[in-house]
Amino acid sequence: MKRGLLPFNKIKLLLASPEQILSWSHGEVKRPETLNYRTLKPEKEGLFCAKIFGPLKDYECLCGKYKGKRFEGTICDRCGVEVTKAYVRRERFGHITLATPCAHIWFLKSSPSKIGALLGLSARDIEKVIYFESYLVVEYPTPDMEATFSNSENTIPVIKDGVTHHVKLHVVTEEQYEKEFAYSIDNRYESGMGAEFVRYVLSILDLETFAFKLKKILKPYTFGFEDLGPKMELEHKKLYEKIIMFLADRVKLYSVGIATSLNGVQMSIEDVIHGIVSESIYLNIKTGEISNQDLGDDWYTSKDAIRYRFEYVRGQNQNIPVFDKIQEDVRNIVLKDFSDTRVKNLVKTLKLVEGFLKSSNRPEWMILTVLPVIPPELRPLVALDGGKFATSDLNDLYRRLINRNNRLKRLIDLDAPDIIVRNEKRMLQESVDVLIDNGKRGKVVSQHNRPLKSLSDYLKGKQGRFRQNLLGKRVDYSGRSVIVVGPSLKMHQCGLPKIMALELFKPFVYRRLEEKGYATSIKNARKMVDQKQPEVWECLEEVVKQHPVLLNRAPTLHRMSIQAFEPVLVEGKAIQLHPLVCPPFNADFDGDQMAVHVPLGIEAQLESYILILSTQNILSPANGRPIMLPSQDMVLGLFYASNYVKGAKGEGKVFFSKEDAFLAFENKKIDIHAVIKVKIGDTFVETNIGRLLINEALPKGYRFVNEVLDKKSISKLIADIHKIYGSEITAQTLDRLKEFGFEMATRAGISIGIEDMKIPKAKKRLVDKAFHQMDEVLDQYRKGIITNKERYNKTIDIWSQTTEDVTKAMFSEIEKSEQIENGKKLPGLFNPIYMMANSGARGNKDQLRQLAGMRGLMAKHSGEFIETPITSNFREGLSVLEYFISTYGARKGLADTALKTSFAGYLTRRLVDVAQDMVISEYDCGTKKYEVIEAIVESGEEKISLKERLIGRVLAEDIYDPNSKELIAKANDVLDEELTARIQQAGVVQVKARSVLNCESENGICSMCYGWDLSQRKLVSPGEAVGIIAAQSIGEPGTQLTMRTFHIGGAATAQKVQSELIIESSGIIKFQGLRLLKNRNGGLINISQEGVIFVLDPNGRTIERHTVPYAAEILFKDGSEVKQGDIVAKWDPFNTYIIAESSGELVLKDIIVDVTVREEKDTLTGKTAIVVSFLRAKDAQLHSPRIVIKSEDGNEYSYDLPVNSILNIPFEKLKTIWDKCLACSEAEKNDVQHNYYYLDKFVVHPGDIIARIPKETTKVRDIVGGLPRVEELFEARKPKNPAIISEIDGIVKIYEDADEVMVISPKGTKKYDIKNEFILIKHGQEVKEGTKITDTIVSDVSGKAIVRAKGSKIVVYNKQTGQEKVYSVPKGKFLQVKDGDYVKVGDQLTDGTPLLEEILKIKGIDELQKFLLKEVQMVYKLQGVDINDKHIEIIIRQMLRKRVIVDPGDSRFVANEEVDVIEFNKEVERIRKEDGKIPKAEPILVGITKAALSTKSWISAASFQETTRVLTEAASEGKVDDLSGIKENVIIGNLIPAGTGLEEYKNVKIEIAEHVTQFKKQT
């Protein structure tokens, strides 16, 4: 089956054998000469030899004896050159026969080294051999050592004289070699150095035996309890014995009760278990007795007997863990035997060996004996003026190589001393390396210290062959020019300058001149065109009629950056662009340029018309909203016309038709803004002339639009019209609105004057008030009530609030004022600047605030705020200081733009690469899976509504109204606005819908899982390249937003921090997961991390859900009624608190001056705060600062203090005492005294704050901060502060984590070493003799315990299953759980961001997908960017495509191999049919770069990044690219397998109809 235009449909990459290289070659290059300096003809047998590579001129030999086409194919007898086209100099290879074999550096120095991996040597060792530093010795086994050698992991199989031997390889220095191997008598050793000997060893490798051996070594890696049995004992005795020992140990530990005497003979428990497993002993699972024979019911043998016995005993005694725990432990014993790196290396080597076996490659071909010389025209030598030459670097590299090669041949012929020959061989090897890849090992530079470009450099990077010439080519029939606005154009037109059109359409014009008889020949026509005769223009007009052209504006960030238009010929040299298509191109007319391309073929023209025409691209594919909208002047005109003015001329008049009203308006009887009544249909409508005129522009039969039109309402209007009437009518409507908008804006004569910026009268009062509040904050700070960080946070908060208040005051003043224009009184709404901002025409409230309110806070480059706000505005002017502060933000904006544009561009490139082969491949994949879709809620606030998330999706199950039980929508319905509105009204909160994440199509995605094509509002059609659309939709806003930072000029607006919970709708509140304490003022304090408050309506349906932070004060009781606007809870947003849960005396432990805490004395206030901070690293090990509350009932509550926490105890209550520090004394072996803080009878009450941890200071959030977060998520990187999450449900216990405990008593110090046990005492505790320190260690003395803690151990224990998990937490990390808390799977135990891999492992693939989607959406939402979920889902799907094999079963995979999920599923199906053992695999998360590099297509991966590595791997494994993706087809010049390049469209024939009749659009 042939696909596309090319005669093949797959491409395989292999290593070239020497014979293959010779078959390409047309002769050997023996001399390093290039051209003769006098004749400038190529030297014979040189690098440009005409005899080898072909003639310099078409059909002419070098000496000139044969000239002309008639001698084609003749070989000249004088100069030996074949008479043919000179073009063959671009395709004929030569070759160089190397005097000694040389290694190919790609296979030598890739990581891991391919040659090294096959020989089981490290990259360093194999390099030493190749570069003649060390000897390689092959050690053959003696007959009695054969078995040992073949079982050893460190040997490799070779075939010698037809027999396979397992041999050991040694890399030894010259001295070692001389000493140990050189004079060995027995014939066991072969040795040599350099590539030649390595080639010999590679050629005798027995690959089949090698693959078998590696599989055998890897086999036990997957073993578990199920594999126990005689076979395992036979093949893997050591491992088998370890597991038997472990089981015996567990039988003893849990008193499982298995008898140890058989027929009166006493046996060890190990032997009994071995007997049961090997099926020679039977076990009664109820009594634990054993016997030689099967005695009926309850008697079992083999490993299952042990399992049944365990389960039976557990039924009696719940303290024994479930048997799964034992199985898990057995698995861990196996894993301990295999280090991760070892398994990885084994798998890599096995893959390589199997690659060689499958691909018919030979390992010795990685060492070159013949080197190809590429055609001379691809490494040209060009004569410049003045007798100089410009040459390609390759010629220099080939010259060095030929020189060294010839010298080596001469030395060998002369029988030179070994040391000289060896050095020359090494130099030859180095010159081969440099030719293939300069810089991999040493760099060769030109005279100007520039590294020479090697063959690899011609492939890789932006300037390499892939990206420069194959993925992006310069095209003919194109031109570029500056753009200007063309307001009179229709939407599908563009103005094309005549001179440009003439050049672009030249061939068409020639043809038309001939057809019309103006010219008799092409030559004649050319002449006419050159002279620009009048007939030429006439023909040009006819030619361009209905011949679309493509316009493109760089940077091409999404598909709307290229659109088709019908050209309209215009005078001048500038392209005219329709104003409405500026937003999709992101174009303006300040000097932007655009490129024009002419589609030549009839198919191309048809595609341009049907698919790319601007009227087809009204909706954005990123979110389905209109992207072609009136903007700026047009919005202003429409806004102006649609506003009322009370008391305008003609107010209150009544008209019986629109026409009457227009007549009155034309006769100046009524004003355009006057409120009048007009009969529309059967009713009288209150409206004005402006609105009537706007409705004239709307489609016939559309509802009467009677509202003020600003940018948002216009957008809704256009979307609605598009929904009802489709693209064509919408385009016409837009054109009419454009005309009217421009006209009204002109008529209104709106302009900006300095007087329009009204400075609010309240400003001075508000600013003064803020300064007064600032003084209060400073005062609190000086008194030491708050810390410096809190002061900063409060300052920012005050100024953010003040700026907001000033802005409000300014707007309300503008709205109340009056304008007088031409003697006409207009309300404040008509203030020109206000009107521009309010209508969305230009500018926004922020900019208005800066013009007439106050500039507010400015951001530093680090993202923090400068505390001094700019209280002036631009109308008043800034003071010098204020101006200086301003420059900060403005400069940040410009620097950001430069840096972040490239960052966003690179992100887009990675996204495109990872998703490029996602194409709609079928209508329905038939999956039964679905996603549960619900609104995205972030800290109690709904960020993305259910409706927004559902539109355009396909339902997976029927939906019924939860109350009336009637059917709302059926499965497989596509959800549009009406259906989603009905679903929401019914109060459905979760909907099961189809999703890209669950699509089961083999390649690509199916239409049903994808849903709507958002730019067409209909189910996506097959062949749509949805992956690339997704990448563009995510990447484009990134680029946009980073480019847009500097427009605000750095005036930062801090988000006012949420510090209270305000109810939005009345109802009944319900608490879930809150734990409340009454504090000394009677207030209720929440001490749960998981608290949620729900608001329910009278029917008990949830209408709001809010999370409540720890330490929030709750102001209502559970179940009370609340009204809208009630404050239910409030908290301090700037601190995390540690709260006393009980009353009692407060005791400080290990709070030591200048050791575990530092006193922060404030220079301004003279107040002191005590901050936890370890001054030396080892202090953190020796001391654990904590607060203990001793309650009246004798209980102790202990609170660890994390780093940076501040004690909330009045400084004057703290006393200090010098005392001996037992831990330090012990560590430093002499008395160490510390200054301890202590409290004298200090009592606390429940709810008291005993310490606080200040949160990070408020920073400016813009997408510049957000883009790195998006990248962190898509690349699956580790966050800076990873959280620990629980893997099981259970109760939390917290222990000290230490290696030793000391008890210090008057008699002396006693040390106890702790090994893998839990410490039952706390640091600093007084212990009595006999107190348990751990389960097995008891204190021999009474005294004070010193625990040298590294941190804490959190143990989660599940009583039902007996499972427990232990987590080590380093010192200084904040624990979110306390002793005795109950946690669920996936709950966070410490602060920080959870690791994506952990979420995957613990909560599963669905939770991870939800998490990723939400996190990415939040970053964009924060910027007000709408991206449909499905685009992000496509990228996430690509990140989760891979599975890692846990147990290969009977499959062709090996353990730990990463395979594509589709491949895995196919293999599972195959094995199911054959009734074999099914392989097991786990999903893994792969970052987008790695995902793009590990795609099936090696062409696509090589053109993305790390070209040489990808090609090396592809060649050694003999990979086949089946050309299924888009990118690889672009590279080889095929039609792409998407859109109209699909197979279905192959047979569509297109003809040009001579007489075009008026065709109606089929609806």
Swiss-Prot record:
Source taxon at top rank: Bacteria
EC numbers: 2.7.7.6
Gene Ontology biological process terms from the UniProt entry: DNA-templated transcription
Binding residue positions for Zn(2+) 1: C61, C63, C76, C79
Cofactors, names only: Mg(2+); Zn(2+)
Gene Ontology molecular-function annotations: DNA binding; DNA-directed RNA polymerase activity; magnesium ion binding; zinc ion binding
Gene3D superfamilies given in the database record: 1.10.132.30, 1.10.150.390, 1.10.1790.20, 1.10.40.90, 2.40.40.20, 2.40.50.100, RNA polymerase II, clamp domain (4.10.860.120), RNA polymerase Rpb1, domain 3 (1.10.274.100)
Any one GO cellular component localisation term in the record: DNA-directed RNA polymerase complex
Any Pfam family hit: RNA_pol_Rpb1_5
Known catalytic reactions: RNA(n) + a ribonucleoside 5'-triphosphate = RNA(n+1) + diphosphate
Binding site for Mg(2+): D588, D590, D592
Function: DNA-dependent RNA polymerase catalyzes the transcription of DNA into RNA using the four ribonucleoside triphosphates as substrates.
Matching NCBIfam families: rpoC_TIGR
Assembly and interaction partners: The RNAP catalytic core consists of 2 alpha, 1 beta, 1 beta' and 1 omega subunit. When a sigma factor is associated with the core the holoenzyme is formed, which can initiate transcription.
UniProt-recorded name of the protein: DNA-directed RNA polymerase subunit beta'
Species whose genome carries this gene: Hydrogenobaculum sp. (strain Y04AAS1)
Taxonomic lineage from the root: Bacteria, Pseudomonadati, Aquificota, Aquificia, Aquificales
Gene: rpoC
